[in-house]
Amino acid sequence: MAEDLTISKTGTKEEQYLSLIPQIEALLYGETDQIANLANVCAALKEQFNWFWVGFYLVKDQELVLGPFQGPVACTRIKKGKGVCGTSWAQEETIIVPDVDAFPGHIACASASKSEIVLPLYRGKNIIGVLDVDSEYLSHFNEIDSIYLTKIIKLLDA
């Protein structure tokens, strides 16, 4: 298991993802505990990109419950179809929000959050949670994030 990440803040966003993905693969290799793997993915993403908040919400009894995360304290439960996370879960799709204040029904867990990306987390064909990433900058996330974060969370279903 890798104990340290080689973090480079130089290069394009895509180059940073390409450098990080094999390191995440090494972190996950041989580890079967879901919580440990989710926690390490959060830590690796936070360390590489220094986002305001990165974490998982896991499906439990028809709502999303806070899982491993990096960042300030967060909302603990989100109903299906509510906010960005609940909407991503209900629609079974990635949602990129350039300005969270413009998203109908946004759940403001932290006022410093300005933009967000949420991706469904699958186990086989079933959604078991979502990856939620927040930035304190407007329009921080784009299709590059969607592509590479999808690749990263697919590693969790391997």
Put a short name on every predicted segment.
Residues 21, 25, 135-158:
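Juxtadomain coupling helices with adjacent low-complexity linkers
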Residues 115-122:
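A short, aliphatic-rich beta-strand micro-motif
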Residues 33-36, 80, 113, 144:
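A generic structural signal for residues located within well-ordered alpha-helices
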Residues 122-135, 156:
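Sensory-domain boundary capping and coupling elements
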Residues 1-68, 151:
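Intrinsically disordered, low-complexity terminal regulatory regions
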Residues 53, 118, 130:
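Short hydrophobic/aromatic beta-strand element in the GNAT-like acyltransferase core
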Residues 48, 108-113:
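Short loop/turn motifs at secondary-structure junctions and domain boundaries
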Residues 59, 63-109:
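Regulatory sensory and allosteric helical modules in signal-transduction proteins
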